[in-house]
């Protein structure tokens, strides 16, 4: 738990070097190529930091602030920390992603000046009561829904056939191993959409991708792209 394990995303390392010759970076370790000199720094006066959102970005921000001496409060409205990374790791081929939020949660647990509120809404009254000098918004984002008639009204509807990625993940254990004869349409051919394809295609479903861009897999690192497109 003390080690920040590689999650095999290939984005900052292989993605930056192969074909584009950019400096190596790391998705989960901002200190790569930058050093960890900040850890030697300490705030010179009392400073309260409020971080809203307990995903990986919020946890990293909260841990870093606490490590340099700030009194830090992290507010998460859900029962669990880790955000989207923890959710995506429920997909079998993405289970290594859980190593990152688990590392951050363990790191946070050792910081006595980091106070974590779970199952808590970040209301104006609560935030003001913590007397913050700095507020960090790490609440994440919502998926972009295309302008398809009826989509907004029917997505994630109980008993319906239209599911968001979050809802699909929450019910991932309910999908049978053999989906022969079933048709799955994935709207969006980016990284997340291709993750969905990788889940359903081996189960023998008839999978189609609908993507507004002229290519699928836009922005995916070259290593993952080769592996996905040869599936």
Where are these regions (language model features)?
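Repeat-solenoid scaffold signature
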Residues: 1, 107-119, 125
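Flavin-dependent oxidoreductase catalytic cores
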Residues: 1-51, 56, 61-72, 80, ...
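Generic structural signal for well-ordered, non-membrane alpha-helical segments
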Residues: 2, 6, 19, 42, ...
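Rossmann-like dinucleotide/flavin-binding elements
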Residues: 43-74, 116-131, 139-148, 164-222
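Rossmann-like dinucleotide-binding cores of NAD(P)H-dependent redox enzymes
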Residues: 74-110, 197-231
